[in-house]
Amino acid sequence: MSTINNPLNIKTRSHSSMGGGMIMDENKVPKSSIGMDKKIGGTTGLKSHRGALSDLTNNTHQTTGMATKTVQLSNNNIIMPQPTNTRNNIITRSKSIIDNGASLRNSALISGVLPNANGPVNKVQKRDIQSMEMMNNIPQQPVMIDDVDNDTNMIQEEQMVIDITEVPENIDIYDSHDPQCVGEYVNEIFAYYREKEQIDKIDKDYIKNQYHINERMRAILVDWMMAVHVRFKLLSETFFLSVNIVDRYLAKVMIPVTKLQLVGITAILLACKYEEIYSPQIKDFVHTSDDACTHAEVIDMERQILSTLQFHMSVATPLHFLRRFSKAAGSDSRTHSLSKYLSELSMVEYRMVQFVPSMIAAASIYVARRMTMKSGPYWNVTLEYYTCYKESEILQCAQELKEVRKRADTSNLKATRKKYLSSKLMEVAAIPVVEF
């Protein structure tokens, strides 16, 4: 323990005059006080002097049967008074820092490393003094750690929202247990359909090469084919395929007007053989046409069409894509039925031949959502991912489809509209058109 050479010149009040309320200077003891008698408990005791940093307690011992106080000059048994605090302690970060600084100063006081004002300072003392100064310089204002955590959480939540909006929904996750949905191959299947629709794309100007057939005649034929489709309760796949067969055949062969209905009947027959489980007989189709053709003529036209198309019957139609896109859109039965109505209406219009089947299906979904949803968005990331079309890319087709839907209310070709006015299909043909 280092000794303190120069005592501090601080005036203190004597212990006896103050009645023990104050402690004298521990480093300076008056000579007059050494050896003075003091009455303790009615007895006279010998008062011992108190050395620097010596024992501050009053020890008693028995001298001739009477208790007297003596002060032992011992540096080994230093006992510092412990402060008590009866208040409820609220622990804060700033209070913890202050308490730590106070503890450091107390420990330095006990160990005797507190320097005198004029005394030398060794390395250990200097390090302790610097530590205490650093403790005193720390701001006592508590740090609100919760504020920092809240800011970090807000940033993470914003990033999570952005990530969720940018990632399309997996629409096949709930069909993994169903082997008929072929979830493992569905992406490859529709990639193949997209390749097929480009390979089998129909010339949008083929009607110009027909000298006897115009757009109006084609529309009448397709509307009559829809009536036959409804009468025999055929599948929607059969209708779309039969119209595709007619367009592909007319794009390669010029025919007279008298053969146009025969081409339509034969196209329905071929589509039924390809799609239906039980196909109507040839005589049924002949009867439906009011005997406009014979059984032999249907057989002969069937041979010609298959030869011209090289027996190529597997094509991509709007219905293939429509079901997939409706699933991506999360459409209910009413919206899906309206989408089918718009797709089948597009088959009547020759101008819609310029669009590939996937585009017609995507535009049908878009227009149907416009007509049934009170507010947007009408196109989202999931639809963009599964349709492979942005909203800006389908607007032209959607505008054409909207005009087709508007003309259907006043057109004489009412087979498609009549079909979708039935309660079975939720009367979606009566839903008014929305301008956009």
UniProtKB/Swiss-Prot annotation:
Residues 1-33 are annotated as: Disordered. Keywords: Cell cycle, Cell division, Cyclin, Mitosis. One of its GO terms (molecular function) is cyclin-dependent protein serine/threonine kinase regulator activity. Residues 1-17 have a biased composition (Polar residues). Belongs to the cyclin family. Cyclin AB subfamily. Interacts with the cdk1 protein kinase to form a serine/threonine kinase holoenzyme complex also known as maturation promoting factor (MPF). The cyclin subunit imparts substrate specificity to the complex. Essential for the control of the cell cycle at the G2/M (mitosis) transition. This is G2/mitotic-specific cyclin-B. It comes from Dictyostelium discoideum (Social amoeba).
